[in-house]
Amino acid sequence: MDRSGYFPVLDEDIPTKSELRLPLESKTSSRSRRWLHLVLVLQFVLIISLLASLHILGNRQPSNITCAKQLSPYSPYLEDGDLELEEFTELNHLMQPSPYRGQPTPEIEEAWVRLWRVPMIGFPETKMINLNKTNPQDYAHVSTRYGDDMLGFLNVFHQLHCLNLVRQYTYRDDYDYSNVTAFRAPQELVRGHIDHCIETIRKSIMCASDVTPVVFQLDDSRKSGFKSDFNMRRTCRNFDKIQDWAVANAVQGDFE
């Protein structure tokens, strides 16, 4: 055998196992670093997105319906989401004309009746628990031919009825109210009805507790040098829409 081209292989010329694995391990390490970078970037994006979402949620104003539901017990009107707020400055000085004030006339009486006399409504029996009524069977229902709803009406109309009755009571010697059922009862019951209405109005006012500041306008004609300015800025529920809703959702037919 021709050994002229043969050179002995020395031990140091043979690559070790670790040296043979080096390229593979280098590739693996590089791939791991890329995945780590990707994970860090994704985490960063996620954190930024979360912070942005929290900022948006924290600065978003709740809707009128959301606020109303937090401040009121259950109401089928609020469930329908038809609440509308109005902002305005009312005119309400001491002698401010109004279709609802002054010496009784047929027109004034009719105007008051149109405020509070609306049909009754129905709402689901399952909602009675939201009104803290645990025995629905003890309360009037709509006739079964129209469903199994509870029979009721919105409290604002009871409050207006009470205010009207107190108004009429103050004019009972100046106007013929013989057609008013409440005044045909025995005097003790009439007085009790009026006192009930005064309590209803008192509680309603205290419950709402309007905290809008009343300011004083300078007036040299007054001994005090100023007068209360009752032309106040108001934010109110749109009463016409509430009344329209009650009429549109009126219960028809006989009641049980």
UniProtKB/Swiss-Prot annotation:
Signal peptide span: none
Subcellular location: Membrane
Matching InterPro entries: UstYa-like
Principal localisation: membrane
Coiled-coil spans in chain: none
Motif segment (HXXHC 2): 193-197
Glycan attachment points: 64, 132, 179
GO MF, any single term: oxidoreductase activity
Family label: Belongs to the ustYa family.
UniProt cross-references to PANTHER family, sorted A to Z: CYCLOCHLOROTINE BIOSYNTHESIS PROTEIN O (PTHR33365:SF4), YALI0B05434P (PTHR33365)
Protein's recorded name: UstYa family oxidase phomYc
Organism: Diaporthe leptostromiformis (Lupinosis disease fungus)
Gene designation: phomYc
